[in-house]
Amino acid sequence: MDVHIQSREGGERLGSAVVLAAFDDLMVSEYVLEPGTEPGDPHYHANHSDSFYVLEGDLEFRIDGRTVRATAGTLVTAPRSVVHAFPVAIGARTRFLNLHTPGGSEGYLRQLDEMRARGETPDAEFQQAHDQYPV
């Protein structure tokens, strides 16, 4: 495998995500969230871990039955089968990295972006096909 160097500007924009790296063993995306966005629905992944590294601002997570506030420099990881929800920005614009190990989640983001562009909402079958199990 070749070395991978990627700027944010050269990443693939998929909804609110910019995919920075997409490999079999790792997928990294960057998000910018404004305060007031709705949290994601609680879910878990059976086949991969989902990690979030806060670059700037504060995020609030629902993970493993708790609410956790993460400031810049904090890493939050939901290992396989741990229930969590996509975070919300607290107080100000927030930037963070989302890491999936192993990789492959970029396909989910692409299809989700296409669905939203058509005004569609993903159903449970779509979610489960992409290792996302609502609870």
Q: Each predicted region: which residue ranges?
A:
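Short, conserved beta-strand element in jelly-roll/cupin
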Residues: E30-E34, Y44-R62, L99
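Short acidic-glycine-tyrosine-enriched beta hairpin
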Residues: G65-V83
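A short glycine-rich, His/Asp/Glu-containing loop-to-beta-strand
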Residues: R8-P42, H48
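Acidic/histidine-enriched, glycine/proline-rich intrinsically disordered or flexible terminal extensions
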Residues: G107-V135
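Well-ordered beta-strand scaffold positions
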Residues: L26, D58, R66-V68
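Short beta-strand segments
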Residues: G40-P42, I63-V68
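Ligand-binding loop in jelly-roll beta-barrel domains
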Residues: E60, R80-E106
